[in-house]
Design a protein with these regions (language model features):
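Short helix N-cap motif at coil->helix boundaries in the Bergerat
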Residues: 86, 169-177
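Conserved catalytic submotifs in the C-terminal HATPase_c
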Residues: 46, 80-85, 102, 107-118
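Helix-loop junction within the histidine kinase core
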Residues: 70-81
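Short alpha-helical segment of the dimerization/phosphotransfer core of two-component systems
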Residues: 54-59
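Primarily the dimerization/phosphotransfer
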Residues: 1-38
Length: 229
């Protein structure tokens, strides 16, 4: 079974790498269209271009998740920690999700204490990826014209980074299962690979931290990442 798992991991990694190149080329071509380098587009062409870009971005995101998963499974997760301000991670996540939030009229609110927050010694790319993924989920699971909250607070020797939505919430029966690979809450209509939360948990735990959820049906969900300051 170990040989089979190893072959599967290698196959997924190879395919993911092969997919990234043509997807990136598609996105570059679409950028040329958006910049009107080949002439102005009519309304129908603009809508088609946006649709293609959204799907290409989603596909690129999935390949990224697969590559992250194979690194974890192969024990090849490389950490490059550096001193990082929590607010920088929050700002990165917001920037990455602002277009999607605007599309659905979702207001992103920031909660950040006025007192000086301690810095983190983390792999900023990986923790930013986690926060971006959590905020993306919050936006996608929110009602149109709703709001989501992203923030940070100090808890003794820890810093908590959190994302909260006010959507339908998660049944308590699935509070642990949502962190399993490929798990999808039964009945959910939001598209996804079922890998994001699993990889996020792996990244956080690789830093010696925890990723937990607080959720109640009909009241939304709050994902909390706790890291040593």
């Amino acid at each position: 079974f170990k040989e089979l798992d190893s072959a599967k991991t290698t196959f997924i990694s190879t395919i993911s790498h092969e997919l990234k190149t043509p997807i990136s080329a598609i996105l570059m071509s679409l950028q040329l269209l958006e910049d009107k380098r080949v002439g102005a587009l009519n309304d129908e062409q603009e809508q088609l271009s946006k649709s293609i870009k959204e799907n290409a971005d989603r596909l690129l995101g999935i390949t990224g998740e697969l590559l992250n998963m194979t690194q974890v499974e192969a024990g090849k997760l490389q950490m490059m920690p550096k001193i990082t301000k929590p607010i920088e991670l929050i700002e990165y996540a917001i920037k990455a999700n602002q277009v999607q939030a605007d599309k659905f009229g979702i207001q992103i609110e920031v909660e950040y204490p006025e007192e000086k927050m301690p810095k983190l010694f983390v792999d900023s790319e990986k923790i930013a990826w986690v926060l971006t993924n959590l905020l993306s989920n919050a936006v996608r699971y929110s009602k149109e014209n709703g709001r989501v909250v992203i923030g940070a607070k100090r808890e003794k020797e820890f810093v908590e980074l959190y994302v909260q939505d006010f959507g339908k919430g998660i049944d308590p029966r699935y509070h642990q299962s949502i962190f399993d690979r490929y798990f999808r809450v039964p009945g959910t209509k939001v598209q996804g690979s079922g890998l994001g939360l699993s990889i996020s948990k792996d990244f956080v735990e690789a830093h010696g931290g925890t990723l937990t959820v607080e959720s109640e049906l009909g009241k939304g969900s709050k994902f909390i990442m706790r890291l040593k300051a």
